[in-house]
Amino acid sequence: MEFVMKTRMFEEEGWIRKTCKVCGKPFWTLDPDRETCGDPPCDEYQFIGKPGIPKKYTLDEMREKFLSFFEKHEVYPHGRVKRYPVLPRWRDDVLLVGASIMDFQPWVISGEADPPANPLTISQPSIRFTDIDNVGITGRHFTIFEMMAHHAFNYPGKHIYWIDETVELAFEFFTKELKMKPEDITFKENPWAGGGNAGPAFEVLYKGLEVATLVFMQYKKAPANADPSQVVIIKGEKYVPMETKVVDTGYGLERLVWMSQGTPTAYDAVLGYVIEPLKRMAGVEKIDERILMENSRLAGMFDIEDMGDLRYLREQVAKRVGISVEELERLIRPYELIYAIADHTKALTFMLADGVVPSNVKAGYLARLLIRKSIRHLRELGLEVPLAEIVAMHIKELSPTFPEFKEMEDIILEMIELEEKKYAETLRRGSDLVKREIAKLKKKGANEIPLEKLITFYESHGLTPEIVKEIAEKEGVKVHIPDNFYSLVAKEAEKQVEEKEEEVVDFELVKDLPDTRTLYYEDPFMKEFDAKVLKVIEDWVVLDQTAFYPEGGGQPYDTGILVVDGEEVKVTNVQKVGKVILHKVERPELFKEGTIVHGRIDWERRIQHMRHHTGTHVLMGALVRVLGKHVWQAGSQLSTDWARLDITHYKRISDEEIKEIERLANRVVMENRRVRWEWLPRTEADEKYGFRLYQGGVVPGRIIRILNIEDWDVQACGGTHLPSTGLIGPIKILRTERIQDGVERIIFACGEAAVREWQKEREIIKRTSQILRVPPEKLPETAERFFNEWKEARKEVEKLRKELAKLLVYELESKVEKVGEIEFIGEIVEGSMDDLREAANKLRKENRVVVLVNKEGHFVVAVGDKLPYTAGEFAKLITSVAGGGGGGRKELAQGKIRDIEKAKEAIEKVKGSL
C-alpha cells in the first residue's frame, strides 16, 4: 500500500513532494533544487567539521531542551515521564527495551491500561544488539542510546493529535528550538512495520543524518479470518486497522548532540569522558582528524552487515585520504576499539543497574557478550586496565542524571570483577577445547573451523572467535570471522520461543459462560461454600462461584470435596481458562447443570500454601535487603512441606548471608506486620509502586491485584495470602542451590513445615550424639577428631595397599609362562581394580601379555608394545567366555565379567590365542 503523506504544514508552507534520484523513495522538501532525499547512501554527512546546529549541546542539555519543549508547549503540553528500566519486567516477549514505545506495549496500546500521561514525552535509554558489529566503526552506531520521544494515544472517542500536528511539532522543535535550517530538512516517506504493528512514517533527515522517525501506528497484524475489505499490505505483510491510533516518534539524542558539535564521530561527542582516558592509557597515536571524519562520512553510507566486508570501507577511506589500507588499519583500529569499549561499558552500566545479572541465558547472556567483547578489545589494545574501572567512569559521569547508578555501584562493579575472573578461567580451559576440535577436523581432512562451530564455542564455552582464530592459526587451521558475527549471536539470543500452555479444555467451550465468582479472594479463610453447576465438560465441572483456588502464580491448586445429592466426590485438580474456573472430579456423571453442590476444601493443604506464599513475599524482601537491589524473582513453587524461590544473583549465597536473611524474615514475622491486598488500575499501580511489582512475572489485565506487606514488600500477585505476617509462623531456610548461571534457588519451609524440619534436625543430632557417646555441644570437636583419625588411618591403609601391590607383583613375576617367544601371566588375585591396574602396569613388558582377574570379576589386560595384539581384543575374548563387558587402548584394557566361575577358562582362552 502506498501512503501519500500530504500534511497541513506541507500544503500551507509550500513543501514539494519529490522522488529521490538515487533510492527512488518519495520525500518532502522546501528546496526546489533538491534531487536527493538526504538519507545515506543518497547523501553524505555534511555536518562533520561544520556543525548543523549553531549551539553546542551536551547530552544533559539536549535532553532537557527536548523534554522542556514538549512539556511546556503552549498548544500541546505533554506530561513528562521518567525513563523505564532497560529490562522490561512488564512484558515477556522481549529481552531489553529497544525503543520508547516498548514502554507502553502491550497494555497501553491495546487499551488495557491508561498511559501515564496523554500526550507524553520521555527520553528512554534503549539497547539494541542488531548493530553491535557496526559499533565503533561507523561513527554513529551504538548498542546503548537514548530515544527521545513524544507519544499520543488516540483512543476511540478521545483524539489527541495525529500526523499534521506531529510533523508541525517536530519541525518547530528543530527550527525554532535548535535553529536548524528549514531548507536542509527533509521528510522522507517510508512505511514502518514491527512488533505486529504498522503504519505510515516519516524519516526526518538533516545534512545527511536521520535525526528522527515519526511513525503513525494504525494497523495490526491481520488474523486469518480478517475481512478482506479491511486488509492492507505493508512491506509484504497483511494488516488491519487498530482501534487505537498511536503517534510513535523517536529522536536520536546522541545524534542531535553529534549534529551540534560536528565531531568526527558521535562517540567523541557523547563518550569523551571515557574515550580520552582510554587513549592516554593505551598510548594511542594521535591521528589526523581528517581520517576519522572521512571514515565517518563514508561509513555512514552503509552498514557492515550490508557490505559484507570491512575491507571495502578501508579501501574507500584510504583512497580519499591518500594512504595505504594497511596504514589506515594501523592508525584507525585503536580508535575503533576504544569507541566500542566506551559504548559497551555504558550499555552494561544501564543493564546491570536495572537488574540484569550476567549469565548464559536471556538478557544475562547479552550482558556477558558485552563484557567479553570489551575484555577482548582491551586485550587487543594491550591494556591491562580492569573493565570495572571503566564502568566506574560511567557511574561517576552519569550518576547526577541517573542516581540509581551510584546506589548500585558496589554491586555493579563486583559483578564485572567476577565476570572478568570467570572469563580468564574460560580462556585457560578454552585452548584445550579448540585443539581437540582442530584434531577432529584434521582427521576429516578439513582445514577451516566452520561458522557453526565458532558460534558453539562462543555460546557454550564463552570463547570469542578472535581467540579461537588465534589458537587455530598456530595449529595451521583457518578461521573466517564474519563482520557481523556478534550481531548473529545476539539475534539468536533475542529470539523468544513462544511457549503455549496446553489448555485444560478448549476456550471455545467456556467462552459463553459467565466469569466464575472468586470466593477465595473475597474470604481467603472460607472453608466451605454452596454453588450451582453451570456446565460439565468431560470430567471438569464449572460452578457459578468457588472457594477452590485454581493453579497459578506459583501456587498449586486446592483439593477437597464437592457434595452432590448427598454423595461426596473428590476434587483432584482446579484450573482456570480465561475467567472461568474448572474443577476436575472423580465421578463427573453425578453432576447435572443447575444442581446445587456443597464444596469443602482441604483446609490443611490450603493454609500451608497460604503460609508458604506469604512467606515467599517476606523472604523476597529480606533477600533484596541483604543481597542488593539487583535481586529479582526468577521463579517460585510451593507445596505443603516446603517452598522454593529462584532469584537472580551473580554468586553463591554465603552462610553469613543466609543467617541474616533468615533473621530479617523471622523478625518481620514476629512484628506481625499487616498484609493488605487491593485491586488497582495497572497505570496507577505502576506509578505508585514501580516495576518491582512484577517480581513474579508479567500480570495481564487492566486491573491488577496488589499484595502489600507493610513497609516490606509489594508485588502484583494472584495467590491467597494471610492477613498478617505473624500467622506465617517461623521461616527456615533449608538449603540453597545454584540451578543455573546467575540464578540461586532458596528452598525453605514455613509454619508447621519449618517446625517439622527443626524436629528432624534435632533427632539427627540426638542420634549422632548417642552413637558418638558425647553431649550435643561436643559433636563438632568430636566429629573433627574422628575425621582426622580416619584420614590418618586411610593413609596407613594406602601405605599397606602399596606394599601388598609390590608383593603381588613380586609373586606374579615368578609365575611367568612362555608361549612360544611370548611371556604370559594369567592369574586370579586378591585386590581392588586400582591394585590390578597398578600391578598390570608394573608387570607389562614389550614382549609380555598380562591378564589379572579379582574375586569380584574385575579384570585388567596389559599387552607389550612389540606384540601384534591389542588389549581391547583380549578384553572382548574374555567377555565372550565369561560374559560382562570391557574395553580400552592397545596397551591396556579393563572390564568386568559376569560369571566368575569361568574366569580361569577365559584366562586360558587368551593364553591359547597367542
UniProtKB/Swiss-Prot annotation:
MF terms from GO for this chain are:
alanine-tRNA ligase activity; aminoacyl-tRNA deacylase activity; ATP binding; tRNA binding; zinc ion binding
Q: Which residues bind Zn(2+)?
A: H613, H617, C717, H721
What's a single GO CC term here?
cytoplasm
The record's principal subcellular location, in a coarse class, is: cytoplasm
Establish whether keyword RNA-binding is in the entry.
Answer: yes
Q: Give a short account of what the protein does.
A: Catalyzes the attachment of alanine to tRNA(Ala) in a two-step reaction: alanine is first activated by ATP to form Ala-AMP and then transferred to the acceptor end of tRNA(Ala). Also edits incorrectly charged Ser-tRNA(Ala) and Gly-tRNA(Ala) via its editing domain.
The record's similarity note reads: Belongs to the class-II aminoacyl-tRNA synthetase family.
What HAMAP family does the record point to? Ala_tRNA_synth_A (MF_00036_A)
Q: What is this protein called?
A: Alanine--tRNA ligase
Q: Which organism is it from?
A: Pyrococcus furiosus (strain ATCC 43587 / DSM 3638 / JCM 8422 / Vc1)
Per the record, the gene is alaS
